[in-house]
UniProtKB/Swiss-Prot annotation:
Record organism: Xenopus laevis
Transit peptide, UniProt annotation: 1-17
Protein name (Swiss-Prot/TrEMBL): Single-stranded DNA-binding protein 1-A, mitochondrial
Name of encoding gene: ssbp1-a
Molecular-function GO term, any one: chromatin binding
Compartment(s): Mitochondrion; Mitochondrion matrix, Mitochondrion nucleoid
Keywords attached to this entry: DNA replication, DNA-binding, Mitochondrion, Mitochondrion nucleoid, Transit peptide
Location (main, coarse): mitochondrion
């Protein structure tokens, strides 16, 4: 009865202990960002490659310095804005993002983080961090209704 599951566990253990084979294991690369769009999206297409919609998204971090750590009492409120480059490759989502994402819109973007490298116009190699969007949820708030 337990022979088959035990054998599967042993095989998995043996695969993990082998120095000659590739170890296959699950990992997670998931990002969720809630913020506002910095500029209207652009669509780019390199020769021979699929088009991509690109826009920036700002997220903010707030904290209070001073005597109290709550927002209801004295102390200075500090804010840090981080800008994220969002790239949308999925055909349906890419087109929706290009047509409907607008500067100032509040979005929830789900995707994965990608670290890449490119050569700029001065032939200097640069690092680039991009969020590859798998899903975009359009949110509204009071600013949209004023």
């Amino acid at each position: 009865m337990f022979h088959r599951p035990a054998l599967q566990v042993f095989r998995q253990f043996a695969r993990c202990q082998s120095t000659d084979s590739v170890i296959l294991e699950r990992s997670i690369n998931k990002v969720q960002l809630l913020g506002r769009v910095g500029q209207d999206p652009v669509m780019r297409q390199a020769e021979g490659k699929n088009p991509v919609t690109i826009f920036s998204l700002a997220t903010n971090e707030l904290w209070r310095s001073g005597e109290s750590e709550t927002f209801h009492t004295a102390g200075d409120v500090n804010q840090k804005t981080t800008w994220h480059r969002i790239s949308v490759f999925r055909p349906g989502l890419r087109d929706v993002a290009y047509q409907h994402v607008k500067k100032g819109a509040r979005l929830l973007v789900e995707g994965k983080i990608d670290y890449g490298e490119y050569t700029d116009k001065n032939n200097v190699r640069r690092q680039a961090t991009t969020i590859i969007a798998d899903n975009i949820i359009f949110l509204s708030d009071l600013r949209d209704k004023l």
